[in-house]
């Protein structure tokens, strides 16, 4: 049986935590930042955890993580 392929886009976006969940960077912080408030940008700086319902989908895209 051939090896399973890792979804490269997902591999660049998600990291697995010790508890088995996936974390990623928040979106909306790359460009067009002048109209966004300092508070909004500050809250977007942190990492976010993927929703529990999406964990199985991400796990399927990242079989060796």
From Swiss-Prot:
Parts forming coiled coils: none
Chain segments carrying region Disordered: 1-30
Molecular functions per Gene Ontology: structural constituent of ribosome
Signal sequence interval, chain numbering: none
Example GO BP: translation
GO cellular component: cytosolic large ribosomal subunit
Keyword DNA repair part of the UniProt annotation: no
Assigned keywords, A-Z: Ribonucleoprotein, Ribosomal protein
Bias (Basic residues) ranges: 10-30
Domain of life: Bacteria
SUPFAM superfamilies: L35p-like
Family: Belongs to the bacterial ribosomal protein bL35 family.
Protein name (Swiss-Prot/TrEMBL): Large ribosomal subunit protein bL35
Naturally occurring in which organism (per UniProt): Pseudoalteromonas atlantica (strain T6c / ATCC BAA-1087)
Gene: rpmI
